[in-house]
């Protein structure tokens, strides 16, 4: 409540103020303590270096007008105006919790409280950035800072608190992930241990036997639950242990999956092996045909730019080399060569039979006994010999005629040739090759 002072005197000052305020209506203002009693009226002093406001009925910074002022009588000249200096309303702002600034780990969405530090230690955070004392008084807000008083009498200024926090956070951001080791007995009074991170499975070395195994899912386990289940309060200070807290959660019960045993199908595997052997055997036989048949052998040398010898050309015996070396061409040329060999064997057998007949006739003629001939008998014998020689000469062309006209019903595929070879063109020097 503003302190009202004595009224000022003089009509010139009052008139000038009234002229500045325009046509607004002035209202007399009284002190609440004196106006209610009706004993004294205190006017408002007007100075030039202050900001003033003509109190209207909608201004709640002053007490309501006293409608019983007419009974008090005239306390001053009617030309006096009553003003009160304008003061800004006082708004008590609630204290803003300190904001932790961590440049290294800027992402704090994983924490429920954005002001909670991103630390990897399991112990309470002993940091000047976080003041843990309880407040004993209501924080008072001024224009520039907020002052708070704690139970132990410490006074905290918001500006100094924020400045110290920024300096400390800039120096300690690099080492904030280091694990701090403290006694386990002091962890009972820690208020941040229950809200800390979760213990990782790998850090519980030596305590796996205490955790039961199950195949079902279960909630997460915290450091407090592990400490209470292991009875770590009874451990001496010399044997104190520290757990490295991580942000990654673990399961209280570990899921054990049995290894899958694969069955080997012996029947299917054996069938595949048999098919593979069968295919490899067929390929080997086809390769042998390619190396044996002259037409295929010459075609293989042409495809691979290998030299072709005169023996290869003689083995062709009038046949054309193959144009392709696929399985169908190899089988076709093999059939063609087999038919050619059959035809050649027949020709050779007929020639051998003809030679054997000639040698037999000449041998019989030489073995006949010589007899004395008379004139009549000698002439008859000469005629018989001449007739026999003529018959033999006539018989020889008739026996050679089928050798030139032997035809076989062989399909003319891929350059197959009919048997039109002459007995005069046969090479008996290469007969041993067949």
UniProtKB/Swiss-Prot annotation:
Residues 266-341 form the bHLH domain. InterPro entries: bHLH_dom, HLH_DNA-bd_sf, Regulatory_TF_Diverse. Residues 365-434 are annotated as: Disordered. GO terms for molecular function: DNA-binding transcription activator activity; protein dimerization activity; RNA polymerase II cis-regulatory region sequence-specific DNA binding. Coiled coil: none annotated. Keywords: DNA-binding, Nucleus, Phosphoprotein, Transcription, Transcription regulation. It comes from the Eukaryota. The keyword Nucleus applies. Residues 368-382, 402-423 have a biased composition (Polar residues). Phosphorylated by the cyclin-CDK complex PCL1-PHO85. PANTHER family: TRANSCRIPTION FACTOR HMS1-RELATED (PTHR47336:SF2). Involved in exit from mitosis and pseudohyphal differentiation. This is Probable transcription factor HMS1. The gene is HMS1.
């Amino acid at each position: 409540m503003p302190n009202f002072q004595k009224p000022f005197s003089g009509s010139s000052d009052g008139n000038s103020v009234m002229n500045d305020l325009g046509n607004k209506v002035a209202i007399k203002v009284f002190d609440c303590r004196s106006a209610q009693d009706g004993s004294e009226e205190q006017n408002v002093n007007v100075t030039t270096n202050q900001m003033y406001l003509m109190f209207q009925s909608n201004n709640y910074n002053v007490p309501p007008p006293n409608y019983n002022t007419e009974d008090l009588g005239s306390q001053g000249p009617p030309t006096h105006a009553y003003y009160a200096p304008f003061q800004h309303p006082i708004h008590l702002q609630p204290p803003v919790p300190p904001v932790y600034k961590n440049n290294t780990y800027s992402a704090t969405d994983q924490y429920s409280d954005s002001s909670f530090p991103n630390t990897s230690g399991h112990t309470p955070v002993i940091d000047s950035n976080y003041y843990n004392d309880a407040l004993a008084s209501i924080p008072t807000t001024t224009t520039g800072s907020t002052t708070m008083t704690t139970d132990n009498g410490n006074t905290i200024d918001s500006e100094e608190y924020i400045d110290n926090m920024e300096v400390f956070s800039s120096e300690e951001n690099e080492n904030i992930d280091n694990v701090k080791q403290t006694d386990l007995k002091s962890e009972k009074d820690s208020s941040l241990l229950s809200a800390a991170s979760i213990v990782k499975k790998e850090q519980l070395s030596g305590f796996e036997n205490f955790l039961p195994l199950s195949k079902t899912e279960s909630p997460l386990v915290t450091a407090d639950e592990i400490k209470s289940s292991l009875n770590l309060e009874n451990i001496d200070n010399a044997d104190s242990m520290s757990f490295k807290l991580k942000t990654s959660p673990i399961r209280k019960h570990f899921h054990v999956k049995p290894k899958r045993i694969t069955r080997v199908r012996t029947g299917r595997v054996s069938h595949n092996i048999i098919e593979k052997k069968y295919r490899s055997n067929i390929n080997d036989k086809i390769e042998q045909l390619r190396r044996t048949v002259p037409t295929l052998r010459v075609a293989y040398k042409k495809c691979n730019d290998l030299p072709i010898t005169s023996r290869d050309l003689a083995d062709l015996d009038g046949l054309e080399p193959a144009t392709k070396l696929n399985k169908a061409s190899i089988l076709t040329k093999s059939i063609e060569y087999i038919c050619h060999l059959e035809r050649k064997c027949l020709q050779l057998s007929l020639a051998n039979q003809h030679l054997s007949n000639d040698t037999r006739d000449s041998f019989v003629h030489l073995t006949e006994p010589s007899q004395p001939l008379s004139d009549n008998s000698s002439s008859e014998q000469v005629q018989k010999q001449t007739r026999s020689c003529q018959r033999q000469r006539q018989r020889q062309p008739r026996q050679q005629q089928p050798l030139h006209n032997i035809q076989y019903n062989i399909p003319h595929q891929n350059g197959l040739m009919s048997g039109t070879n002459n007995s005069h063109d046969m090479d008996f020097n290469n007969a041993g090759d067949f």
